[in-house]
Amino acid sequence: MSDIYEIGEALIGDGPELAHIDLIVGSKQGPVGTAFATNMASMSVGHTPLLSVIRPNLPTKPATLIVPKVTVQNLDDASKIFGPAQTAVGRAVADAVEEEIIPKDIVEDIVLMVNVFIDPSAKDYRKIYQYNYGATKLAIKRAFDKYPSVDKVLAEKDRGTHPIMGFKAMKLWNPPYLQVALDLDNEDRMRSIIRDLPKRERILIEAGTPLVKKFGVEIISKIREERPGAFIIADLKTLDVGRVEVKMAADETADAVAISGLGTNESIEKAIHECSKQGIYSILDMMNVSDIPSKLEELKLKPNIVLLHRNIDSETMRDNDGEQQSEWGNIKDIKSKLGKRGLIAVAGGVTPEKVDTALANGANIIIAGRYIIGSSDVRRAAEDFLRYLPQDSDTMRLALDEDEKI
């Protein structure tokens, strides 16, 4: 077992007594064994490691070192670590051996290092014990099960919300979406509309060009005040100095920036690169671009999203192969230029009755402006679109049921 090196993590409980365990399991002869000895010999003020014991004079097997994550500042803090937390970890390790989570024949060959989180405001020793016992045993099981798998991580990375973070950072992983274009010049009206919009993950909020021109990119932060977890697009229609404008929008917490497809390839690529660097989406607005597929082929860096506008001559439009095009061109052909993760947004006189057609032709994002922001009943107008879209992705999901195999 000289090559064993596994990592486990678990969070259990609620309130100040919440338990968060990080642990490493490894051979005494390997790097974990070295770290174990080093930590015992090199104590840190406020983070003194201690051997896990089930009771005085009875250390658990395999040998386990507990390291407090939060600085121990007084004897009250120390009592929580040396009392309920230490007992919880020791018993969890012993029970993991008894239940054959840890093979009994390797307990003398391996060691565990367990990082324990104890909130200084925690009071209930029973909860400290129970939560840390459960979290430690679960973390051990996860370590030996190699949980989570890479596939699990990729499936969950854009879905979860960290309980301490308090809000969900949206990613466009499960289209379709409705993008509400706030093409306004009045901040009070903007706030009123946002408050009236349904609180749905399917809704994206666009800081329209008039808003940005009148109030600057700071208007993005004002939108964020009204809806902290929203996905916000800054419609800058960037033509030049894209890097500067993208960074300005990103600094105000924009999730995406719209770049004009009329810019030079160099300017567009610089803006797309800056979006990638800032960790936000790039949207290439193809308004008045005559040959969209060719434009995309010319770009070395592709945008995350291409925005297509309705062509008024669409009823007579066909592509080079004679295939009838949608109002927004041959969406499937355009999407093929972006790669499998590329998205298509459509705009231009979109009404609820056109949603099914747009989605059937391959659109991922439906952009609506006047129909919603010009309505006396903003919520109803938005719901006119939303009834054509699926439920929010996790409406019927019981996330905890999907975490562990039985």
UniProtKB/Swiss-Prot annotation:
The keyword Lyase applies. Residues 165-406 are annotated as: 3-hexulose-6-phosphate synthase. SUPFAM superfamilies: Ribosomal protein S5 domain 2-like (SSF54211), Ribulose-phoshate binding barrel (SSF51366). Pathway: Carbohydrate biosynthesis; D-ribose 5-phosphate biosynthesis. Keywords: Carbohydrate metabolism, Lyase, Multifunctional enzyme. The active site is at H20 (proton donor). It catalyses: 5,6,7,8-tetrahydromethanopterin + formaldehyde = 5,10-methylenetetrahydromethanopterin + H2O; D-ribulose 5-phosphate + formaldehyde = D-arabino-hex-3-ulose 6-phosphate. Substrate binds at D22, L51, K69, T71, Q86. Gene3D superfamilies: Aldolase class I (3.20.20.70), Formaldehyde-activating enzyme (3.30.230.60). Its EC number is 4.2.1.147, 4.1.2.43. One of its GO terms (biological process) is carbohydrate biosynthetic process. In the N-terminal section; belongs to the formaldehyde-activating enzyme family. In the C-terminal section; belongs to the HPS/KGPDC family. HPS subfamily. HAMAP family: Fae_Hps. This is Bifunctional enzyme Fae/Hps.
